[in-house]
Regions:
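Inter-motif core of Ras-like GTPase G domains
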Residues: 126-149
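C-terminal lobe/tail of nucleotide-utilizing enzymes
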Residues: 160-240
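Switch II (G3) loop of P-loop NTPases
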Residues: 99, 103-127
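N-terminal phosphate/diphosphate-binding loop that engages ATP/GTP or pyrophosphate donors
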Residues: 4, 18-93, 97, 102-105
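Conserved glycine(s) of the Walker
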Residues: 14-15
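Hydrophobic anchor at the beta1->P-loop junction of P-loop NTPases
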Residues: 7
Length: 240
């Protein structure tokens, strides 16, 4: 059975892609055949191959399964704005069925699929659909990325509550240091650990060259996602 997780964040620009890259790297180290999926991405650049989003390219690079770009990111938009706005402007409606068919395809290729959302939990994809709606329909366990800074405690608790109200498990959370640790950093972290009531998967430190790093998996412990991982050798996960 393919393991599936949905990565959301307390806000935009809190390091979801950094955390997703770290999760893929950690799962790769455990021998899983991983696939990253960010079905909707805005803020992309025109290349010789067409529009390309740097977050989607990162997930493609860290996926153990060789994937085409369109398998990782079926909906790509140039302007860095909310997906429902730019998709309406361009006349390219985002369909939940397309998001799901892309996920099914990856489930057939990998045994560990990581889905990265856009923005925060309730990011709209259309006038009638949010990323939360789709994650709920797919019954995806959620991993929350918390950008550690002033205000993150409230944002994290609100998001965790919304995830649980959707009937989805909060499988774990990651602290991402989006700035050099400040005076109250340790206290923010302690409060989050005390109040989130979900497994803490690890803290990704502030690193200047973090987007280029291939060793971020060392900062995460995936055993909280599946206790069986503590004894699972790499050979236990053959190619599907």
């Amino acid at each position: 059975v393919t393991k599936r997780f949905f990565v959301t964040g307390t806000d935009t620009e809190v390091g979801k892609t950094i955390a997703s890259s770290a999760l893929l790297q950690a799962a790769n180290l455990l021998g899983f055949h991983t696939a990253g999926y960010t079905p909707v991405a805005s803020g992309s650049e025109l290349t010789g191959d067409g529009l390309r989003n740097e977050d989607a390219l990162a997930l493609q690079r860290h996926s153990r399964v060789a994937l085409r770009y369109d398998q990782v990111n079926p909906y790509t938009f140039a302007e860095p704005t909310s997906p429902h706005i730019i998709s309406a402007d361009e006349g390219r409606p985002i369909a939940a069925a397309r998001l799901s068919s892309g996920l099914r395809e990856l489930e057939g290729l990998a045994d560990w699929v990581l889905v990265e959302g856009a923005g925060g939990w309730f990011t709209p994809l259309s006038d009638s659909l949010t990323f939360a709606d789709w994650a709920q329909a797919e019954q995806l366990p959620v991993i929350l990325v918390v950008g550690v800074k002033l205000g993150c405690i409230n944002h994290a608790m609100l998001t965790a509550q919304a995830v649980r109200q959707a009937g989805l498990p909060l499988a774990g959370w990651i602290a991402n240091d989006v700035q050099p640790p400040g005076k109250r950093h340790a206290e923010y972290l302690a409060t989050l650990k005390n109040r989130l009531a979900a497994p803490f998967l690890g803290e990704i430190p502030w690193l200047a060259d973090i987007a280029q790093r291939d060793d971020l998996g060392q900062y995460l412990d995936l055993r909280a996602l599946d206790p069986a991982l503590s004894t699972a050798p790499a050979a236990a996960h053959p190619a599907p």
